[in-house]
Amino acid sequence: MVVTASRTPEKKIDANADVAVVTSKEIEEKHFDDVAQAVKNVPGVFINSHGASGQVGNSDQIYINGSPNVVVLVDGMRRNTNGNSLMNASIAELVAMDSIDHIEVLKGSASTLYGSDAQGGVINIITKKAKEDGVKTTLRTSFGDNSKEKYTLYNAGKEGNVFWSVEAGKELAGDYKDGWGRKVINHLNAEHYNVKLGYDLGNDSDITLNYEKYKADYTRPDYGSTSIVSDKGKKDNDSISLQYKARLSEKLTNQFSVYRNKTTFKDNYGKSAKDLWAMDMKTTGISDQLTYTANKQTLTGGFDWYKDEVPYNMGSEPEGDSVHNIAFYLQDKIDLTDQWNITPGVRVDHHSAFGTHTSPSLSIGFKQNENTNYYFNYKTFFVAPNMYQLYAPGIPFYGPVGNKDLKPQEGNTIEFGINHNFSDTLSGTFNIFHTHAKNLIQHVNGYGFENTGKANVNGFSLNLNKDFNQHWNASIGYSFIHMPATAPNKNINSDGILPESTLNINVGYQADKFNANLSGRGIMNRYGTKADWSGKPTKMSNYANYWVWDLAANYQFTKEATLFARVNNIFDQFYTDIGSSQDPYGTWYSAPGRNFEIGLQFQF
């Protein structure tokens, strides 16, 4: 397995980092609807979803190693948004799953190469590129309960030096029932288009133009799953990018990218102006990277520039506001001996609102042999408040939301890890970390933002992967995170939003024409919000522990045709992914109960 945690390809076992990979094979066999579904079972990753899908209402909030400050990339290009309240990137709206080659989840601060705001980690989505002449087409359709329908077309190929891919899809969904059998208002009518066109320049060089489009109409409950009042919304996102990769010499490569991402949504439209939430967000960016590889040294350097804008926000702040950031970075991996390596790095950011900041880093690796690698990392981070946290208008009866006096969140992460192959069929990883942050930016009384002081996060994760024989395989991952409560009226782990322990289990079976995967996710000690805005204790602690099991199966009955099925939440577990929910009969966002999906796939 080759990964790019250091922005250069290397074997996964050699990476001085805690990296998990979701492969295209796993995406195809488990039929994930979006990137959020694909990464939520990665140990150390927690996804806050307000219902059946982040496509309905707010997109899913991502946490890695306890931090919501995560950088999301597609082919190395930034996809974070700036201006919304509940998300850092719209990963539930990244639904072009056939176009994905693999997803790398880098856990732990990665500030030097990926951005000083990558406090928790990085999700890098690597898309497919046709490498051999020929054309491949995939057609897929599926139906399920809760009025779910899904249709997808994917075509990719290469002819001479020209390569391309085209993906189009439509998804429909209706009301669902939670684990208690209660109906939850839900409607989705979404479509997406993705076009990639490239030219192979030879000598490991190419130029690629990519365009993505996502549109959706949705209906959600007004406030919590028990609400009988429905609110309507619309989303309209698009992204365009141009990327040039070149091998300038045997030792020197270059990657240049320019991109523009746009997100538009209207939530609660059709109601009074005071209830409408309409917003446009736009990001424009340019990046360039040079990598020089010698016998015992890999030098990586470059610059990133991006500008975040909120062109429209219902005529209130942050409408018309923008921020920009330019950064220069340099990292040098030096092989001191055949076993020891050291990687110093530095990133210098200049933020238009918060000035210049330097983020140094240091990594030390010891490769005991071909099967064992130890590493120690020290990384710093610098997270500027987003425009919503700075400028959002106040809410009647609740007080101010935005706070123009916020300071950037700063700190460092120290981690130690081991990557080890016990045998050809058994591998494992272990990682332990400590993060210290100051000027922590948090909600106060559920609405306004303040710097609440310091925070110390301790955690570790353990993963094992085993191939028993040609048919059976299994994996197990455990992660532990502890963040002390920041006030007497708060719970641990960001007031109970995050679980202390998570256990992820996967069992796979593979035969000539049949395969199946059983996945389980155990959440332990996620106590939820301790008190509501009035100080009254919530009932979240009664639902602090639960298990959710999913099953996916595929049967290839001809060379071109495959029948597939999914059962989600097999045991009809009642739960919520939103730790800030308070009462199952009040402010509560239920996840779907047991639900089914069956479909056909044709490839030719």
Indicate residue ranges for each PLM-predicted region:
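N-terminal periplasmic accessory domains that precede
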Residues: 35-38, 60-63, 73, 90-93, ...
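Extracytoplasmic beta-strand/coil segments of soluble accessory domains associated
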Residues: 36, 40-78
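Gram-negative outer-membrane beta-barrel transporters
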Residues: 335-342, 432-436, 451-533, 559-562, ...
